[in-house]
Amino acid sequence: MRTGRYSYNAQQRSIVRPIKRVQKLAEGFAQNYDCAVICHEKKEIVSEAMMTVSAKEDIALAFYRACNTVFAQRGCTKLVNVSFLWPEDSEEAFMAELTGYIAALCQKEAVKLGLVTAGVSSFVQKAVISVTAVGYANEDFTDNDGKNQNKTLQAGSTLCMAG
């Protein structure tokens, strides 16, 4: 376990490699095609959630909070961008664990992981995560007049909620 100043090598070991371990996410996405799929939908929805991180559960909370805001607007999350701000004395193993966890969450929820950025500051005491979820409005929830219809959940449907 290494502690100390954040460096390029630490970024490669703790951020890039855990993402590459998840093969589907390591392939990335077709730069022009997938962006076009998101942008050509009728209504784009963007949501952001920021929190301090002390455990993996905090990452899940930020992830689902951003995704649920898109869902609350009758949308479907397609892409997630994540930004970390680490204290200077962060443990590399903790950084790697959290980065791998966000990649696993994206794979579990069938959401593309678009961009992961990280920075270091002497002004933060705990890690800070910012999750930006991008999605589009789901047309299945509107009728011909554009008014919302009340839909009931089917058996076996998954509903995720975060406070």
Residue ranges and their predicted role:
Residues 33-37, 63-72, 117-119, 146:
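Short, charged beta->alpha transition segments
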Residues 1-55, 82-85, 97, 101-117, ...:
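Extreme N-terminal cap/leader segments of soluble proteins
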Residues 131-163:
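Phosphate/diphosphate-binding glycine-rich loops and adjacent basic-rich segments that engage nucleotide
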Residues 84-92:
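Glycine-rich, proline-tolerant flexible connector loops at the mouths of alpha/beta enzymes
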Residues 119-125:
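Glycine/charge-rich, flexible interdomain linkers and switch-proximal surface loops
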